[in-house]
């Protein structure tokens, strides 16, 4: 018998190479590129906005005093911030075997990188919610009695991950990932951590079975999808406590995308941009999309004829194309109103495209991401069991996205990924 340790005999083995691991892209475009305020200490946050401006103009005579329209001011609010907690655990035995010191040729030298990798993962989870909503994947084939579900976003699953499955009628239940087949887009689930495959046949495509981060089906951050779509098109009826249909200020331009295909993508893209420019205020200069739609856009530009930066009727800006180490790609096109930048991001879904004004939203938080500290200043919590001591490190994010100018944006909804195959 002995106390638990993670690295076991590897502690005393020679490690000339850095840890081999999957490339973890920074899938946090929304968090990285919105305005931020980290001074919110909780409580109700007031979101005041001018719902209507004075509009009384009369030709030839003065407007009667009783007939003058006034500025209309509305008081919206966010009741409190959302909480996201990320947790990691380490075994004390791993440190004891090296007398508390981490030598260079030891597997323990990966610990600092592991903490940073986990923070990147946590940012991805939050950024998905801020962009496209609380669920991160959907079933594309009905679940099986053998625990297998075919999903649309296999890249968002990891071994031992806790996942909540929920359908329109099927109640939510928690499962753990025990196997992943990248090529088949299949994930196998157990009802217990480390257990055998569980029956997940109740979760079907017809019932819109979706995968959520633990408890995200109950509480999640305000998403662009929900904020910009009208209730008729799948969004919420209210935003920051006020009814969207009561005020044009709260209404983003909604554009149906069912007719968007890989063959007409550029025409549809600019038709949508024109529609947003006609109806919206501000400058929606960013087009946010996933790589399915973004890839079709790039192919269409390359295949539209011409040479150099001139591609048929579409002119690539001198900024050209820009691939980012942070996990997104951009291509900038010239328009009659300046430039428009198409941003392809990993944490986006293929059924929506957003024409985004970067100045229209602010993420307000209490210190952004930070490790939990106890009153003694320690950034870990000590746990004692019969198997030894363990240290738990918790990272928290208290905050919420405030959409200060939703009417400046546009959203294309109902895009069919099958149209881009």
Which role fits each region the language model picked out?
Residues 1-58, 72-421:
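Core alpha/beta structural scaffold of self-assembling particle/tube/pore-forming proteins
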Residues 57, 64-68:
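N-terminal amphipathic/basic membrane-interacting segments and domains
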């Amino acid at each position: 018998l002995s106390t638990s340790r993670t690295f076991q005999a590897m502690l005393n083995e020679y490690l000339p190479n850095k840890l081999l691991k999957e490339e973890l892209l920074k899938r946090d475009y929304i968090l990285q590129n919105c305005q931020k305020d980290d001074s919110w200490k909780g409580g109700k946050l007031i979101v005041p906005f001018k719902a209507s401006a004075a509009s009384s103009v009369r030709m030839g005579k003065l407007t009667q005093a009783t007939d003058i329209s006034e500025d209309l001011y509305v008081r919206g609010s966010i009741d409190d911030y959302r909480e996201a907690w990320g947790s990691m655990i380490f075994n004390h035995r791993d440190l004891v075997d090296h007398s508390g010191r981490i030598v260079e040729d030891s597997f323990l030298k990966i610990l600092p990188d592991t903490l940073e990798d986990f923070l990147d993962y946590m940012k991805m989870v939050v950024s998905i919610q801020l962009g496209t909503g609380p669920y991160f994947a959907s079933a594309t084939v009905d679940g099986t009695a053998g625990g297998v579900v075919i999903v649309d976003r296999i890249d968002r699953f990891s071994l031992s991950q806790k996942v909540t499955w929920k359908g329109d009628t099927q109640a939510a239940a928690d499962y753990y990932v025990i196997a992943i087949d990248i090529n088949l887009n299949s994930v196998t689930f157990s009802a217990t951590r480390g257990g055998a495959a569980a029956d997940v046949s109740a979760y079907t495509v017809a019932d819109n079975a979706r995968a959520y981060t633990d408890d995200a089906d109950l509480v999640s951050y305000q998403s662009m999808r929900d904020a910009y779509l009208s209730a008729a098109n799948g969004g919420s009826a209210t935003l920051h406590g006020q009814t969207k249909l009561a005020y044009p200020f709260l209404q983003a331009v909604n554009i149906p995308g069912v007719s968007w295909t890989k063959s007409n993508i550029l025409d549809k893209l600019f038709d949508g941009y024109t529609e947003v420019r006609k109806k919206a205020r501000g400058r929606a200069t960013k087009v946010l999309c996933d790589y399915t739609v973004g890839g079709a856009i790039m192919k269409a530009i390359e295949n539209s004829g011409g040479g150099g930066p001139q591609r048929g009727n579409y002119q690539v800006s001198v900024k050209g194309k820009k691939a980012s180490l942070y996990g997104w790609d951009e291509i900038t096109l010239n328009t009659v109103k300046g430039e428009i930048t198409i941003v392809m991001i990993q944490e986006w879904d293929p059924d929506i495209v957003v024409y985004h004004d970067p100045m229209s939203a602010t993420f307000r938080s209490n210190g952004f991401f930070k490790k939990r500290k106890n009153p003694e200043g320690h950034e870990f919590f000590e746990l004692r069991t019969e198997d030894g001591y363990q240290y738990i490190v918790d990272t928290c994010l208290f905050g919420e996205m405030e959409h200060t100018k939703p009417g400046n944006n546009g959203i294309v909804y109902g895009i069919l990924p099958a149209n881009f195959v």
